[in-house]
Amino acid sequence: LLKFDAETTRLLEIAYQGAELTRRRQASFDALCPAPGETILDIGCGNGMLTAELARAVGSDGYVIGIDPSEDMTAAARERCSDYANLEFRAGAANSLPIEDESADKAVSVQVIEYIDDIDGALDDTLRCVKPGGRLVISDLHFGSLIWFSGEPDRMQKMLTSWNQHFVSGSLPERLPALIKARGNFVEDVLPFTMTDYQLKPDGLAIMMMHLMKQYAVANDHVEPAVAQSWFDEQHSLAKVGRFFFSMTQFIVVVHKKG
């Protein structure tokens, strides 16, 4: 799995403030429909950007709890959200949440469940924390939707094969509705959010993935450093001549808990 250390946190911080990932975050926010006075869980809260937005939305009568297993991420989140009195951060994973039963009106997770070995446990524990009739929004990338041009397709495939080892489930969205319904809950909607980049935006998803993929492939001895660097450099070269192209879709599953 990818290690969310201080350097990774810094890379994510830049991209998460960019327009593309801000729109992605907004799509999950809109699907959740936070309302004044609600208690909301932000599961896998990362650096706290969505947590802060939720805290503003629920107001002083509401409360938001951000949960993440990474100390570096929660440190960044606490710093970002230090002015908010209606939120807190707790250490924990999606399949063992430090939350009381049926204590939250709503819960959201953005690109979290795909990294969990125990997907069934994560779904069960998240649903446990939400009140009957509450809403759960789960947003994950489908890595099968990835389109990424390269003039060296074999090298690109090596990098993608390496990257495919950093998550547990790259196809979770196609299975998630059935898993939800099997538990007696209702799927209100599945909303696609496609991110397309033909310029190699400095603050986009593609450039963030390029840095992380190069780092991950070399650190895990999946490819030689020179190969990873050549792949990285090619994408910049393609962008300079107008040939860069990247696209991937995230799916937002909106769940209504039974009861």
Residue ranges, per PLM feature:
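Class I SAM-dependent methyltransferase SAM/SAH-binding core
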Residues: 41-43, 47-96
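Core SAM-dependent methyltransferase catalytic element
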Residues: 183-185, 250-259
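Conserved class I S-adenosyl-L-methionine
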Residues: 1-38, 49-53, 72-76, 80
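A short acidic, Gly/Pro-enriched loop at the edge of an enzyme's catalytic core
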Residues: 95-106
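Conserved catalytic/acceptor-binding region of the Class I
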Residues: 137-201
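A short glycine-rich, Lys/Arg-flanked "PGG" loop and its adjoining helix->strand segment in the class I
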Residues: 120-135
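A short SAM/SAH-binding and catalytic strip from SAM-dependent methyltransferases
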Residues: 106-118
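C-terminal helical/coil "lid" or tail adjacent to the Rossmann-like core of SAM-dependent
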Residues: 1-15, 188-244
